[in-house]
Amino acid sequence: GTAIVPSSMNTVASVAHGLSGNLLLRAADVTLKEGRKLVMVPRETPLHSIHLENLLTLSKSGVVILPPEPAFYLKPRGMNDLISYIVNRVLLALGVSDDLPTDLQYTGE
């Protein structure tokens, strides 16, 4: 599979509409064409309706849209914890790992 981290709205729009004008876009296009897992982590906020429509188009095409939302309920000790959580979520979405490490799982505490 392929992960695009971060994904600008330009990249999101290009992939959503089948444009492949550079190596990154071509890799995403081939990933979709071959039915492989594509994970995109959009980096921009706020989103307007065109952004949301492009993300919906990608989702309907099988792309995993994974917003980089920090898991504050895990009580991160710093930026490394926040980054580690997002990286592990991407690896999980790609199928590289089967579960989040126990220190990154919510236990209700």
Question: How would you name each of these model-derived features?
Answer:
Residues 1-53, 58:
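Helix-loop-strand module that forms the ligand-binding subsite of alpha/beta enzymes
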Residues 38-51, 63-77:
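Phosphate-binding/catalytic loops
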Residues 55-59, 82-85:
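Short, hinge-like loop/turn segments at secondary-structure boundaries
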Residues 64, 69-109:
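Glycine-rich phosphate/pyrophosphate-binding loop and the adjoining helix
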